[in-house]
């Protein structure tokens, strides 16, 4: 008949309330928060009777250790106690208050309210589902490629392989086939495919090469005749204007001039005038022109009575061309 033992949560409560294990105390009894000494065995000053007392008591309670029968193994005691604490559904670690390093390392835990029957059922169903998933994964892992290779290696082949080889031909049959087969000329390999080339576009160095040199066509005879007619008409119009303007030759002090002012008298009034060439003088602008002689000495006061209606300042004297 199996021996019934106390569960871990009530056993822990009893150990905390007994105050027999150093460092195992309540931090907040109302919230059920307590601490457990968790000093590492490699730290200086570690004592098996002081720092591993709780883990040894739990090993004795579970029957995994009996004094005098086995060698003390504090490392295994601590690992078993940690796994048992993590498996409890109603105890959780308060990680923000725990200290895992140093000589004063402790772990802080909180005892939660006891689970109801419904919560226990849900937890059991969840654990069963997890166990089934693990079993499926394990079965899938067993059917690895190694099993297939083992199955292939276990299959044996027959010792007699004569059925796999083709039957040999008789030499006489081969000679008959060669006689019946027409002589084949050596195959001449000829490629009928066009050569594959990459199209390359040649671009001229300058834009002047893009346009061809072109010569303008010569004008037709009809167009040339039209231009000559227009030039001839222009000359005739100029001559008519000169005839109608009434230019008259005059001679003053032996110098010849042309006058077109209204009211001008014929040459008989002024006397005999003759045209005379004037020397060519270079003008400031670089042009060659004809200038008249000095007319300061000429007395023209008698012309005031004859040419009263005429505005003398507007008279323009033009020398005769040679």
Swiss-Prot record:
Q: How is it modified after translation?
A: Phosphorylated by CK2 and this positively regulates its activity. Sumoylation represses the transcriptional activity and displays enhanced resistance to protein degradation. Sumoylated by UBE2I/UBC9 and SUMO1. Inactivates the tumor suppressor activity. Elevated levels in tumor cells. Major site is Lys-276. Sumoylation is enhanced by PIAS3. Desumoylated by SENP1 in tumor cells and appears to compete with ubiquitination on C-terminal sites.
The record places the DNA-binding region at 5-113
Q: Give residues for the crosslink Glycyl lysine isopeptide (Lys-Gly) (interchain with G-Cter in SUMO).
A: 276, 296
The record's subcellular locations are: Nucleus; Cytoplasm
Where N6-acetyllysine occurs, the residues are 78
Instruction: Kindly indicate whether the keyword DNA-binding belongs to this entry.
Output: yes
Ranges for region Disordered:
92-164
Q: Which Pfam families match?
A: IRF (PF00605)
GO process annotations (BP) = apoptotic process; CD8-positive, alpha-beta T cell differentiation; cellular response to interferon-beta; cellular response to mechanical stimulus; defense response to virus; negative regulation of DNA-templated transcription; negative regulation of regulatory T cell differentiation; positive regulation of DNA-templated transcription
How, per the record, is this protein's activity regulated?
Activated by MYD88.
Give the chief site where it resides.
nucleus
Compositionally biased residues, Polar residues = 141-157
Q: What PANTHER family does the record point to?
A: INTERFERON REGULATORY FACTOR (PTHR11949), INTERFERON REGULATORY FACTOR 1 (PTHR11949:SF3)
Function field: Transcriptional regulator which displays a remarkable functional diversity in the regulation of cellular responses. Regulates transcription of IFN and IFN-inducible genes, host response to viral and bacterial infections, regulation of many genes expressed during hematopoiesis, inflammation, immune responses and cell proliferation and differentiation, regulation of the cell cycle and induction of growth arrest and programmed cell death following DNA damage.
Q: What is stated as this protein's family in its record? A: Belongs to the IRF family.
Q: How does it assemble?
A: Monomer. Homodimer. Interacts with EP300. Interacts with MYD88. Interacts with PIAS3. Interacts with SPOP.
Specify the protein name.
Answer: Interferon regulatory factor 1
Q: Name the species this protein comes from.
A: Sus scrofa (Pig)
Q: What is the lineage of its organism?
A: Eukaryota, Metazoa, Chordata, Craniata, Vertebrata
């Amino acid at each position: 008949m199996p021996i019934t033992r106390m569960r871990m949560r009530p056993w822990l409560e009893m150990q905390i309330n007994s105050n027999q294990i150093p460092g195992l105390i309540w931090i907040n009894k109302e919230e059920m928060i307590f601490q457990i000494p968790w000093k590492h065995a490699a730290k200086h000053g570690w004592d098996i009777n002081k720092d591993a007392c709780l883990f040894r008591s739990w090993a004795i309670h579970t029957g995994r250790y009996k004094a005098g029968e086995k060698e003390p193994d504090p490392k295994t005691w601590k690992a078993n106690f940690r796994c048992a604490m993590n498996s409890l559904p109603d105890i959780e670690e308060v990680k923000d208050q725990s200290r895992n390093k140093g000589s004063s390392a402790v772990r802080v835990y909180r005892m939660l309210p006891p689970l109801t029957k419904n919560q226990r059922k849900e937890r059991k169903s969840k654990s069963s589902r997890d166990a089934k998933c693990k079993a499926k994964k394990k079965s899938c892992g067993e059917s690895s490629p190694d099993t297939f290779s083992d199955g292939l290696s276990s299959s044996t082949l027959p010792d007699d392989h004569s059925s796999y080889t083709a039957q040999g031909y008789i030499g006489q049959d081969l000679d008959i086939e060669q006689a019946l087969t027409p002589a084949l000329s050596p195959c001449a390999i000829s490629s009928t495919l066009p050569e594959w080339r990459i199209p390359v576009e040649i671009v001229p160095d300058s834009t002047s090469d893009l346009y061809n040199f072109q010569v303008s066509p010569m004008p037709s005879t009809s167009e040339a005749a039209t231009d000559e007619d227009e030039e001839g008409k222009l000359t005739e119009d100029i001559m008519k204007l000169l005839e109608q303007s009434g230019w008259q030759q005059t001679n003053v002090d032996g110098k010849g001039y042309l006058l077109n002012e209204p009211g001008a008298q014929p040459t008989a009034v002024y006397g005999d005038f003759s045209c005379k060439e004037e020397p060519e003088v270079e003008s400031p602008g670089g042009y060659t022109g004809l200038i008249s002689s000095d007319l300061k000495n000429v007395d023209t006061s008698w012309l005031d009575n004859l040419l009263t209606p005429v505005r003398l300042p507007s008279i323009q004297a033009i020398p005769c061309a040679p």
